Amino acid sequence: MALDSAFERAPCQSAVVYGLMPSENENNTPYLLRLAQQGAALAQVLLLDEAHAWTDLPSRTAQTGWLNLVQDVPHWLSLDELQGGQNLRSQSQMSLPICRENGAVLGVLQLEYAGKNGFDEAAQIVWLGLALALAAPLQALLQPEKAEEAQDE
């Protein structure tokens, strides 16, 4: 419901909540799994490795724990700060980490907008608020033992 509400207040082309999952593959690479979405569908699974950090903004955000705001995707592509033709599906992207209180990344909120400069200050506030609000439920979903420890403190 919170994703629906934020999407109504700050509409965009795509809004996706990814959960950070432990590695379940032979090369021990953790990945992001799409848990919820509004608007156009984005990738179901994104690996967290060096190659994907350049091609998928949510992977970069999950690896660094930093918010990434790209108001002009073609410009970032021309600078090689972002790579891959799939990024041309939008002109603006914002990728926000969803973190525990200690800064550990639980997931990523990925947003895409059809036009350049798609995320004004009001939209950034709405989406940042959602990223903060998602921390507790995402921790309970993905790390239930740590959520119980936090409640006991």
Model-found features: residue ranges?
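Short loop/turn motifs at secondary-structure junctions and domain boundaries
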Residues: 84-91
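A short, aliphatic-rich beta-strand micro-motif
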Residues: 92-100
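Intrinsically disordered, low-complexity terminal regulatory regions
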Residues: 1-40, 140-153
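Residue-level marker of regulatory loop/turn positions in helix-turn-helix DNA-binding domains and
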Residues: 50, 87, 119
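Juxtadomain coupling helices with adjacent low-complexity linkers
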Residues: 107-153
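Regulatory sensory and allosteric helical modules in signal-transduction proteins
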Residues: 19-83
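Broad gene-expression machinery/nucleic-acid interaction feature
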Residues: 14, 93, 108
